[in-house]
Amino acid sequence: MRISLNWLRELVEIKLSPEELAHILTMAGFEVEDIEDRRTWANGVVVGRVLERQPHPNADKLSVCQVDVGASETLNIVCGAPNVRADIYVPVATVGAYLPNIDLKIKPAKLRGVPSQGMICSLKELGLPSEVDGIYIFPQENLPLGSDVRPLLGLDDVILDVTATANRADALSMVGIAREVAALTDAKLNIPEPGEVSVSGSVGKLGLKIADTQACPAYIGTVIEQVKIASSPEWLQQRLRSAGVRPISNVVDITNYVLLEWGQPLHAFDQERLKFVANADSLTIGVRFANPGETLKTLDGQTRNLTTQNLLITANDQPVALAGVMGGEETEVHEGTQSLILEAALFDSVAIRRSSRSVGLRSEASGRYERGVNRAELEIANRRALSLISELAAGVIVHQEIADTRPDPASWSRSILLRLDRVNEVLGPINVGETGELEAKDVERTLTALGCELTPAGEGTWNVSVPPYRYRDLEREIDLIEEVARLYGYDNFCDTLPDKAEAGYLPVDQELVRKLRAALRAEGLTELIHYSLVKPGEDRQIVLSNPLFAEYSALRTDLLAGLIDAFQYNLEQGNGSLNGFEIGRIFWQEEDGLQEKDAIAGIIGGDTSLGKWSKGSKEQPLAWFEAKGILESVFQQLGILVEYQPDCRDERLHPGRTASLWIGGNRLGIFGQLHPQLRRDKDLPESVYVFQLDLDVFLNALDKDEILVPTFKPYSTYPASDRDIAFFAPVKVSVSEIEKAINKAGKGLLESVEIFDEYRGENVPQGQRSLAFRLVYRASDRTLTDTEVEPVHNKVREALVEKFGVNLRS
C-alpha cells in the first residue's frame, strides 16, 4: 500500500524523517519496499502566467509565449503544446531546474531560431499521471506568480510503499497505519470521526433481501438523489494519485478515498440504471449466490460466466455486481447520473476468496474482504462517504435500509489472559544498560498503545481486551507476546544463546524404523505407500459412515492386498516385477471394540534373471529359500533371530509354502508364496512371495541394549573342527527343532549348524526322512583336539536320540 506522508500527518503527529519512519515500520514487521521522495521532482518549477501567445515564425506546431513568473522580466518560452493559450496559470521549469522523471536540465536554448528561457510543463514531465495531451493548466485563479508549484500539485509529499503481512488486515488503510505509527512513536492520533447523517425523504424506496446471512452479515443501502457528477477537488485527486489510484469522478473517487482511509470497500450504483435492469420502479437489493448459467459484465468490460461459488448483488434478483469484487458495467455511475444507491457491506472472507478465484478477478476490495474487514467500523466508513457525497456532489440522502445479523457488539472484542512470567520466558532478557527483564509497566504501556484494554487479574497477570480492528490476528497469549516484542523492538532484546542446549535426537522407535527401512532398501526393495481406505466387503472391516467415495469407504485390515494389487498393476503397465515394502497402519473390529496397529509388509517375486545381461533362455523364478533369504538377511543386519513354523491359515497363501515367524515366543508375522489360484486370477508370475510383520513386536525385539549398541566380538584365529551327523528322523519333527536341540547340546564349543542333505524315498523308513547336518566346533583361545570335541559331539548325538528318537546313521 502506498502511504502519503502528508495524508498520514493529518491522522497522526509525525516528527520523524521519512527514512526514520521507514526504519521504524520495517523493524515493526512492515516491509517498506520504496521511499518515493516527490519533493525532488519539481525543484525549480514555479507558477507562471501566460501573458501572450504567438505562432512560431518557423514551425507550425510551436508557439512563442510570454510568461510572467514574478521576476523583473517576462520569459520568452517556446512551447509545443496544443492547449497553450494566453491568460492561463501553468507550471514553468526555469533555467537551471532539473526534471528527474525525464532526465532533463533546463538551459537557455534556441528552437527553430527563437530563444527559449524555460519550459512550460505537463504533469507527465513532472512525474504525475495525466490524461490530458499537453501542458497542465491550474484550475485555480490568481495564484502567486513565482511560487513553488509542489504544494499545488502534491509534489511536496513523500510516498512510502508499505507491505503488510497477511494477518494484518487492519494495516490496509491509512487509519490502520496511523494507529500503528502512533503505537510505535507514542504520537497523538487525530482520526476523523464523521457525524451522523440525516435522512430527509420518503420511506419505502428501497428493500433488502439477504439470502445468506453468513456470506453477508451486514448490508447498508442508502438512496442519494440530486447528485451532481463532476471532477473531484484537487486535494482529493492528489491523495488518490499518491496512492496509485486514477481519479474518475467525485462519487467514484469518494468511494475509493474511503476505501483507502478506512479499509472499508464501498460501491455506488446508478439508481435509474438499477431500475432499468430490474424493469421496475421499486427496487429490492439482494445478496445471493449465482445460479449456473448466469453471466455478468463487470466494470472492466469482461463478461463473466458465473458459478454457484460467485456471491452476487442483485436488483430484483437480476445480477448487477460481483459482491465484494467488482461492480457491473450496466449500473455504473456515469456523467449523467443523478441518483445513487451507496452500498456499504460486510462479506464473508471465504465466500469472497472463492468468488474471486472462480472468475480469476482480484481487486482492491476483494483483497481487503479476503483478509477480513473490521466489522465495527462499517457505519463509520458509510457516514464518512455520505458526508463527502453531500459536500462534494450536493447529494441529498432520502432513504436508508439496513440488514444486520452481526452478533452483539460485545463479542467483537475478545479477552486474553496474559502472564508477565510467560512474556519474559518467551522473549528473554532486554538491554537496559545491564541485562534485565520486561516489567509490568512496559507491557501495559505497549499493549495500551495498540488499543488494548488491560484489567489486572492478579500479580503480573492481566485480562487483555483486544480492539475490534485487531480481532482477527490477536487470538492467543503468544500473539500478545509477539506484539510486545514487536513494539518494544526486537533489537532491544539480548541476543545471547540459552545457557544449555541439548542436541536433538530421534526416539528409539523412530531410529529403529529408519534402520529397518535402510535394511529393506539394501535388499533391493522399494518403499511403497498406499491409501488406508479400501473397498468394503471384507470380514472385520471398519466402514466409514460418511466416505468421500463409495469405493474408498472402509479401512484396510492388512497391507498385503495393496501390495498384491500394485504388483499386478506394474506388470500390466509393462514395468516388470515390483519388489517393494510398505510400513503403515491397519485397522479391524473386535468384539471389545475397534483395533489398530502398525505393520510392515513386502512382496518379492518374478524372474531374477531378467535384466540387461542375458543369463540363458530359460526362466529362473525366485525360489522359496531365495525369497526367505532376503528376509533373513534383513533380520541378520538388525541382529535378531527369527524362528519359522508351518502355517496355512491365510487362504491367499500356498498352504505348503507358508510359515509363521516368531521372536522369543511372540508371533511376529507371516511369510509365504501366493496361492496358485490367486496367482492365476491376477495373471502373476509363478513365484511371488509376501510377508507381513507386526511392527510393535519387531520393535520390542530390537529394543535391547545388545542390538541398539552392538559390540564387536573378535573372530577366532584358530582352526575349526568339522563333524557330520546323519540320521533318520520323523517327518513331523521340523529342522528348526532339531537345530535348536543341537545348539543347546553343543553349547560352548559348537560354532554353527547347517543342514546339507535331505532325502525321502527308497530305503527310508515309512514316515521318516534322512537328514544330514554339518557341525562346526571352534574355540576362541586354542586349537581344539579330538579328545575335546568328541565328548561334546557324542552329547549332541545322545540328545537327538533321547528327544526325537532318531536313528543315527553316522
From Swiss-Prot:
InterPro entries: aa-tRNA-synth_II/BPL/LPL, B3/B4_tRNA-bd, DNA-bd_dom_put_sf, Fdx_antiC-bd, Fdx_antiC-bd_sf, NA-bd_OB-fold, Phe-tRNA-ligase_IIc_bsu, Phe-tRNA-ligase_IIc_bsu_bact. Its EC number is 6.1.1.20. It comes from Nostoc sp. (strain PCC 7120 / SAG 25.82 / UTEX 2576). GO terms for biological process: phenylalanyl-tRNA aminoacylation. Disulfide bonds: none annotated. The keyword Protein biosynthesis applies. Tetramer of two alpha and two beta subunits. Residues 716-809 form the FDX-ACB domain. Gene3D superfamilies: 3.30.56.10, Bira Bifunctional Protein, Domain 2, Ferrodoxin-fold anticodon-binding domain, Nucleic acid-binding proteins, Phenylalanyl-trna Synthetase, Chain B, domain 3. It is found in: Cytoplasm. It comes from the Bacteria. GO terms for cellular component: phenylalanine-tRNA ligase complex. This is Phenylalanine--tRNA ligase beta subunit.
